[in-house]
Amino acid sequence: MGQKVNPVGLRLGINRNWTSRWFPSARTAPSNIDEDNKIRKFLKKELYYAGVSEIVIERAAKKLRVTVVAARPGLIIGKKGVDIEKVKEGLKTLIKKEVSINIKEVKRPQADAQLAAENVATQLEKRVAFRRAMKKVMQAALKSGAKGIKVRVSGRLAGAEIARTEWYMEGRVPLHTLRAKIDYGFAEAMTVYGIIGVKVWIFKGEVLQKGIQFEKKEEAKEEREPRRSRRGRQ
């Protein structure tokens, strides 16, 4: 089960929270979902250079608040807040509502799954060898404190005639363990041979109900050598 489903959706309400936070009704739910989708597409396109990891949308009464979690928040805000005002005006024109925007910084960009997936996709678009791109991202994540990482790419790799899937994994990535804090990211690389999908799973430790991360002593002692596999199925 844990190997097949989205690890974020599987852990909602356990150690992950929803990115759209509002109370739906039969009348407003469809329009709200459509608005959320438009907001995310707009911000991803306009703020791609800032390394956007997550977009959280909150609604209360007639207020709409958007929190953008990014690796380079200074590029979003701009000099004296000029750039962020342009983004607000663009959102207001798009959805015909007043929007307040909060900016948060990603503490460890190298250990963020979404940014790692986009990094691999960007390198593939620049014609970097896919194995080199994958290993580079994995090494950076492990140096930033990740307990384990798995990267998978699918498509016409290196211009091959037949599409295939290849993946690497280092450390532990326990997808079945619900208390495990698994970060997940997905991106697509638009290459001359077609679209290549990139998926990244990063294990950041186990979380108790109070939010305390821990690592079992027995597991630390019996830690196995990092596993690597170039080809395989999830």
Curated annotation (Swiss-Prot):
Keywords: Ribonucleoprotein, Ribosomal protein, RNA-binding, rRNA-binding. It holds the Pfam family KH_2. GO terms for biological process: translation. GO terms for cellular component: cytosolic small ribosomal subunit. The keyword Ribonucleoprotein applies. GO terms for molecular function: mRNA binding; rRNA binding; structural constituent of ribosome. Part of the 30S ribosomal subunit. Forms a tight complex with proteins S10 and S14. Belongs to the universal ribosomal protein uS3 family. This is Small ribosomal subunit protein uS3. It comes from Helicobacter pylori (strain G27).
